[in-house]
Amino acid sequence: YEVGMMKGGIRKDRRGGRMLKHKRQREENDSRNAGALTEARSTALWPSPLMIKHSKKNSPALSLTADQMVSALLEAEPPVVYSEYDPSRPFNEASVMTLLTNLADRELVHMINWAKRVPGFVDLALHDQVHLLECAWLEILMVGLVWRSMEHPGKLLFAPNLLLDRSHGKVVEGFVEIFDMLLAASSRFRMMNVRGEEFVCLKSIILLNPGIYTYLSSTLKSVEERDHIHRVLDKITDTLMHLMAKSGLSLQQQHRRLAQLLLILSHIRHMSNKGMEHLYSMKCKNVVPLYDLLLEMLDAHRLHAPAAKGSPPSEDDPLNQLAVPSPSMHSLLPCYVNKQEEGNEQEAI
């Protein structure tokens, strides 16, 4: 044979490369099949009566005009909830906390129904719907409180029959700091003259907050879920800009107002974290018993907290006695479905 030629026309130093190529192809096929199996198992873990009716790319929410989006969000607004305030009862730490936790628990029932009506929300996996609500529920309650209190300087309108000032906040240990932050946010809303259409957009942005992506389901569909949330958030942001343009603001003023509104959301997040710590403290001190749904939400939020994920909880931590997450099903899931059914029955009545 001539130099460089071998019998069969295949050089030994090339044969190994071809074998590695075939090996890589087999590994890629095995990985693809394993991913499909994992996805199928994940879907089986979450049997849901709330079936996803549309693919993410064909979601009706993404085809809505700005005016249609505003109309949908306004129609989704929950009903007014009254407190169980009794003027004959004295105002003390226990009575105030009982009033507020009872009110929050009943508002949470309506919040679930509201979230289901936010365009694009039900197109997410049920597991991710639950996670988003678990992480944002107190922020949603607080931004609603701030909005209701706009016309009451120096006071917070928790319900139509429950208007509290700073002196009432001092009754509860550690609550006055949160009370002052809520008053400051309400004052900011009033100064900016936030309108109802802008408020419902902000509340929906809180629900779909991109900072919560780390808590979404770890499946092959998670990327699609995140992309869908991005698209819905873009749609809501465009709706906000449309509202500002209709009000006659220049483009520069629109951008400035949008930035100011979104900056308030970081303040709402900070208040929510403070409120969660305070509520958990009240729970540990047995100041007031927490209702089922409120307790589930509190436990779930703490289980998702970055601090809780970063280090294992201590055996002495009261959190261990409050809730134990299920390895296959989230503890809030049955409550999530049941509360929605209860809300639907109340609306039918």
Swiss-Prot record:
One example of a Gene Ontology biological process annotation: estrogen receptor signaling pathway
Biased composition annotated in UniProt, kind: Basic residues: 12-24
Gene Ontology MF term list: estrogen response element binding; nuclear receptor activity; steroid binding; zinc ion binding
DNA-binding region: 1-5
GO terms under cellular component: chromatin; nucleus
Matching CDD domains: NR_LBD_ER
Primary localisation category: nucleus
N-terminal signal peptide: none
Domain (NR LBD): residue spans on this chain: 65-301
Domain note: Composed of three domains: a modulating N-terminal domain, a DNA-binding domain and a C-terminal ligand-binding domain.
Quaternary structure annotation from Swiss-Prot or TrEMBL: Binds DNA as a homodimer. Can form a heterodimer with ER-beta.
Protein name in the entry: Estrogen receptor
